[in-house]
Amino acid sequence: MVSQRILCLAMALSLAGLSQPSSAAEAPASAPAPECAANAPLDTRVEAVLAKTDRSDKQRANDTNRLSETRFVLAHVKPGDHVLDMGAGEGYASMLLSAAVCTGSVDSQNPQGWVDFYKMSAARDAMAAARPNVHLLTTEFTAILKPAAPYDVIFIGTIYHDTYNEKGQDAVAMDKALLADLKPGGLVILTDHKTVDGAGISATNTLHRIDKAQVLSDFKAAGVELVEDSNVLANPADDHAKIVFDPSIRGKTDRMALVFRRPL
């Protein structure tokens, strides 16, 4: 009798064990970061990338002035994208793009002269250490190495005018070389400080501004189509007569916000 009771108890315990789900089955799948969730609203993505705790106080200090540009750029970037951030400086936009592309990657480019003159090395190295999906490119605008895979997006943030200040620069040739590294259907997102209509490139090295008509002409000649010409960064109060670093207008200049697409 005792042996029968022991046998029954053993069987009951065994069945009870079989009925319990394993701890692995109980563990829920980890949710993606808010900026990486499928179909996440733009506001959610922007708030999430700005909230990253590894961003410096210097970067955060620019968030208010650059919010409209950030929203404009991130509206055209998605998780998994491979992005070139051209003339990236210390990496304000590169950090935001790094979070926004999630499993994608960002090539953060600067000419060596910029890195040396503006003493960017420490900030760039810190960014690359904090964000494994950011790769530093230190090369001239006309010598950007061909990526292993074509870019989904090329971002040229308020520095296109600077490319005209490089000796021997051929803007259209540079644009064509960049577009060769962009996948068919890929986007070029460009913002820059506007000068008075008809000024062409006369103020690129003095006021650090460029005529929007010049930019449109350059990229048309390079073979891309304009798909968006937004006024999101417009400021009618800017008289276009001041250098963009003037304290009265810095961060509030009248800027173009353009999106070009490489044909399929």
Segments and roles (model prediction):
Residues 237-264:
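Core SAM-dependent methyltransferase catalytic element
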Residues 80-89:
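Conserved class I S-adenosyl-L-methionine
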Residues 144-154:
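A short acidic, Gly/Pro-enriched loop at the edge of an enzyme's catalytic core
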Residues 41-78:
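Class I SAM-dependent methyltransferase Rossmann-like catalytic core
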